[in-house]
């Protein structure tokens, strides 16, 4: 396991901002995190498939969807990484796409682990 897989939720999510967005509704926060756990891997797989197929337009669209989801959940670093990936796909820069994918996937792995621990009650 990498250090990112042991990182706390606060390293990935601006919790004060997110709690304000949901009006401190812990039930809504739990629902949003559950949706994230369900949707994020599907979108990441779709992104991987689009990149492997050379469908950069689809990769750009999927990266854009990931960026929006992450930004709405106050996951700013992940949203920035998705934005970098979106820009690389738009530019058609294969080398940058690969670098951006590696950075995004590493961050997303740690983020999903942190959300999982949070959901399991493993941290506040």
Language-model-detected regions and their locations in the chain:
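Two-component system phosphorelay core
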Residues: 1-124
């Amino acid at each position: 396991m990498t250090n990112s897989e042991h990182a706390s939720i606060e390293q990935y999510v601006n919790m004060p901002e997110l709690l304000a967005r949901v009006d401190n509704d812990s039930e809504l926060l739990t629902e949003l995190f559950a949706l994230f756990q369900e949707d994020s891997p599907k979108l990441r797989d779709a992104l991987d498939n689009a990149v492997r197929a050379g469908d950069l337009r689809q990769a750009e669209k999927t990266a854009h969807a990931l960026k929006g989801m992450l930004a709405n959940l106050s996951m700013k670093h992940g949203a920035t990484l998705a934005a970098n990936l979106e820009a690389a796909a738009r530019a058609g820069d294969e080398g940058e796409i690969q670098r951006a994918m590696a950075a995004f996937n590493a961050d997303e792995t740690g983020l999903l682990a942190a959300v999982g621990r949070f959901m399991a009650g493993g941290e506040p």
